[in-house]
């Protein structure tokens, strides 16, 4: 029997996981929106952020240092990958872009497996968030509330960068017409490298704040990648607000349906995605198709 306490707990679980999915998906949609590249290595970057944070935590014992390492290391990795590999595929067919990012993801996963093995690792939450918080007639894990807050702040910061800064104006202009941006004398290569780094950072940041919730393994990014693509399709490819809306919808679907039968959670998520594709192919808040 489902009680109100159980229902509200699952509702908050959905918000927390939805905010995390929104953060990951925002990185993917920023990369696709500005560069036109569907990054199949995004799940591996999520995983790599978790492991980078794990290394930092083992070295310092500080969760804050782990979070910084998970985010900043992926800025560097993303920028380096864009500069050395990805930029050579912008003019190539989409299937080539998919293959190269898929290959990058496999290389990252296997390098991590070689370095750390396949056994699960964990990063403990900060001491102040290790317990539970009373919330009326239920108690809820404090760290999950922290995840919700951190993800919301990160999404707000990304929104400010995209909609309140010169870089954001250039990125959004590139989403509409990247050729025009180049004609204005802007260093498109540098902007594209920055965009890919920001997108990778969003995945890495999500990876480390998720590490105290779900144990780290080299394959942890696989299911996240699938869910992220579903979120992007539901919200709208290339739409930052759509990534947030899609993430929250997906999080609640996965959480609430698990009360009935966890086996149906993924089925319901894909059913909703199919319904959105039938009724609104561009997604709930999607942009028009790229030319």
Where in this protein do the model-derived segments appear?
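Cytosolic-side transmembrane-helix boundaries in multi-pass membrane proteins
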Residues: 6, 24, 84, 115, ...
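Alpha-helical transmembrane segments within multi-pass membrane transporters and channels
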Residues: 61-105, 111, 245-250, 280-281
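Short, non-helical or kinked segments that cap or interrupt transmembrane helices
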Residues: 19, 26-50, 91-97, 167-170, ...
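Membrane-embedded helix boundary and interhelical linker motif in transport proteins
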Residues: 12, 34-80, 84, 89, ...
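Transmembrane helix-bundle core of multi-pass membrane transporters
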Residues: 88-164, 191, 256, 260-261, ...
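Helix-loop-helix "hairpin" substructures at the membrane interface of multi-pass membrane proteins
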Residues: 17-18, 135-216, 240-246
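Membrane-interfacial amphipathic/re-entrant helices at transmembrane-helix boundaries
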Residues: 1-23, 52, 63-66, 92-98, ...
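Inter-helical junctions in multi-pass inner-membrane proteins, predominant
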Residues: 2-20, 140, 161-166, 192-232, ...
